Every structure is written in structure tokens, then in C-alpha cells.
């Protein structure tokens, strides 16, 4: 019963905001503001007459939620899974399907779930003006979110700040995301990998190594070996910063041996050779550094992203 009250209340609340109506405007001549507030917060069951009048003003019908909403909820779960695993074909397919189906959804929880995942989708597409706009809009609804929705919002903020090179803000939000994920029993390896990336930018090598290793073990368990390579690249870079050159050299040589197993072998090889050049530059062996940089250029395409963008592909 309580769940039903909350669902109806949240729908009334959401539709009111959607139509840019104040509580006073919605309830005028129908009920008091305090009574409407209790309805929106699921604290009281509105009489059928009042509910009919409120819905008429909001131009919605007082009916049970359509079955399509459960189907949409399942599809949103699939979309999240595709976004987490960066299955771009699936991401685009589900996005297209949702465009028509979301028009039939009234449920506040489902609409917010969609908007939160849509923001993650925009991050994947690197559409930063749209991401900023969505995050600002979502912020207004934060108090109404479920714990998991708050996690999704916080994670998207962290990713956005990272891609804007605001690393301290990114660390703040990604750290909060990790805490929330542990509290909720939610696991996503990308959270740990992105924490490793942020710590790398902030030059906190021991934390970079910690989170990169956590992410790497997770990816191994999921048989996502291309992402394991990303973690190894980051770990080796941290070893260079810590002047543990032999450890870094061992990792890069291993990556070069394994590169042919992957579809994007040229990209992997280019990054490894580039970073070997950086390693020998730090050792002041400039001849070897130059040799590796020149080898790297044979593989590096003009449109290739820089190192961080290349390893960041799982975000």
C-alpha cells in the first residue's frame, strides 16, 4: 500500500514539475498546499475525487500503470548493462527502441532511471554541453532518487569532471560513488578503473596502483582481457613515475607480445611503444627513447586519441 502511495505521489510531483506548475497552482480550488505536499511525498492517500481533479489539471488519467512500464524497466536494465560493458551496438539499439516506449511511461522512478542512463549515454558520446545540461536538470530531482539512482547520478558527475580535467572534483564524486556502491552491494569495475585514472592525473601513484589492480582482477574474472590491457598500461605508467623501471618494462614487453590477440592491436602497440619511449627518456637513454617514439609513429594514426583518452574507453 505504501509503495502504491509513493508511486502515485511521485507521479503527481513529477508531472507538476514537468508542466512548471507550483503546488499552489495545482491545488488551487481542489485542496490545501499541505494536503498536496503529503500526497506528493506518499504520506497520505488522496480521495478519488481529489485525485481525479488533480489529474485533470495535470492532463493525465488516473489509471493503473501500464504493463509497458515493466517492460521498459527491464529494457533500461539492459541498457545499463550495455553502457557498463561499452557494447556500443547494443547501446544504440536499445536507445532507439526506448525513444518510442518512453512516451507511454508515467512512472517517476522509470523516467528518472531513463534520464540518468541517458546522461551516461551522452558521456559515452562525449556530448559535453548536453551532459552539463542534463546533470543540471537531474540535480533538481536528487532528493527524490532511490539510493541506486543517486549512485548513477554521482558516478556521472565524477566521469564528467574527469573528462573536463577537473580531477579533484572528479575524485570527490568517484570516491563517493565507490562508497555508495559498496553500501548497496553494486559492483562495476569501471568505477575502480576510473578512480585509478584520476589518481594517476593527481600523481598519487600508490592509489593508482591499488585501484588499477582492483579493476584488473575484476576484468580478469569477467574475461574482459582488452580492459585488462588498459589496466596494465596504467600500472606500468605508475611504475615509471615511481622509478620502478624494470617492473614497467616487463609489463610493456608482455603487452607487446599479447597485442596481436586484439582487433585494435595497432592502437595497443602504439601506446606501449610510446610509453617505452617515455620510460627510456626517464632513464636518460635518449637514443632508445627516440627509437621507440619513431616506432610508435608507424602505428599511430593521425586521428588517434592521446594516451588517457585511449585507456579511458571503458568509462
Model-found features: residue ranges?
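Residue register of alpha-helical TPR repeats
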Residues: 73, 113, 152, 190-192, ...
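A short, Lys/Arg-rich alpha-helix, primarily the initiator
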Residues: 1-18
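Short alpha-helical DNA-recognition segment
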Residues: 20-38
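DNA major-groove recognition helix of helix-turn-helix/homeodomain DNA-binding modules
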Residues: 47-64
